[in-house]
Design a protein with these regions (language model features):
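Zymogen propeptides
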Residues: 1-178
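Residue-level recognition of well-ordered beta-strand positions that form the cores
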Residues: 5, 202-204
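Short, Lys/Arg- and Gly-enriched loop/turn segments at beta-strand edges
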Residues: 204-217
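Loop/turn positions that initiate beta-strands
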Residues: 193-200
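Generic recognition of flexible, low-complexity loop/linker segments
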Residues: 34-35, 188-189, 210
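Short alpha-helix capping/helix-loop boundary micro-motifs
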Residues: 178-191
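Hydrophobic beta-strand core residues of beta-sandwich domains
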Residues: 173, 190-193
Length: 219
């Protein structure tokens, strides 16, 4: 067993999660990850592989530097979260996402960058790749960031740049942008969204059914 003894109260020491090539699907070795992220402000001295990797990236909910990369649909996959005060949270996390649109009202997003199933609304980000990979059935809406990437804590504002498209699928994800993709009853919300409107997405992360705030990194 290898381990480090580290004074986490030292202001110069931090815990960070980094993604290989800063996207979900790249396969990069642990030594190469810090090597590609080292700079005068970030010198890495220890690292560990944080999760198993599948076709959609890490299996579990993943956040890095305050950005939500992916969420796990259920509660059966354990993870460790790090908050802004360097406190660790462990357990089986579950994340909810609230969508608020001036034209479509309020709705729930099932997950981020996950495989879309029946009667689900999924939010895809450009961290997944260039397209959603969805089949034809359903409705998809393209958007760009108003105030940065999808936050793991707090509200993210987005603006619709591609009006609702029905029964085509595999929509291109705008650079540094998003696609809302839904099937079944969730399409009732998406078809009401309009080109140029600004909407909000707000996550809430639960560890073992307890809402946890200020999570910046998790896997």
């Amino acid at each position: 067993v290898f381990y480090t003894t580290t004074d986490m109260t030292d202001p110069n020491v931090n815990l960070k999660l980094i993604m290989g090539k800063d996207n979900l699907t790249s396969n990069v070795t642990v030594p190469n990850m810090p090597a590609s992220h080292n700079d005068p402000e970030n010198i890495y001295f220890a690292g560990v592989n944080a999760d198993f990797i599948g076709g959609m990236g890490p299996v579990g909910t993943t956040a890095a530097n305050g950005e939500m990369y992916k969420s796990y649909k259920g509660t059966g996959w354990y993870a460790i979260g790090i908050d802004k005060d360097k406190k660790l949270h462990s357990g089986a996390p579950y994340t909810t996402f609230k969508l608020v649109s001036p034209n479509a009202g309020q709705a729930s997003i099932k997950a981020v960058n996950a495989v879309r199933s029946d009667n689900e609304m999924i939010l895809y980000t450009s961290r997944k790749g260039s397209t959603t990979g969805t089949k034809g059935a359903g409705v998809e809406v393209g958007a760009v960031a108003v105030d940065g990437p999808l936050k793991s804590e707090g509200t993210t504002r987005m603006r619709v740049t591609v009006a609702p498209v029905k029964d085509v699928g595999n929509m291109a994800i705008p650079e540094n942008g998003f696609v809302l993709s839904g099937t079944g009853f969730t399409t009732n919300t998406l078809t009401k969204m309009q080109l140029g409107e600004e909407f909000e997405v707000t996550p809430t992360i639960y560890f073992d059914n307890v809402a946890t705030t200020d999570i910046t990194d998790m896997c």
